[in-house]
Amino acid sequence: MSLINLTFKKIRNEKRPVLLTYTVAGDNSKKKSLEILKSIGKYADICEIGFPHNTPIADGGQIQSSAYRALKNGIKIKDVFSIVKDFKKSKQAKP
């Protein structure tokens, strides 16, 4: 069973809602993005990390702004994977 499925099963047994958060990788800076993930990861059950792209037309205004800031700051796909890797090293087994 995947870590996400295990998390949902655990939370369902606790009879509470799941706190699933979302952030765009690289918004503000690579370092700050990791700090934000570590901070929200203390409370979130699942952390979703978005890849910034230059045509986020299906996303809302806040996510569009975050994606544009990340791209303006030079975030690359390899940086997103690096942020995720560093986050997973610093965090317990959260999806």
Give the location of each predicted region.
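N-terminal amphipathic alpha-helix/helix-capping segment at the start of soluble metabolic enzymes
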Residues: 1-20, 83-88
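Hydrophobic faces of well-ordered beta-strands that scaffold small-molecule active sites
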Residues: 19-23, 47-49, 95
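Short secondary-structure boundary/capping segments within folded domains
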Residues: 10-14, 27-28, 38-40
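Short coil/turn connectors at secondary-structure junctions
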Residues: 14-18, 42-43, 91-95
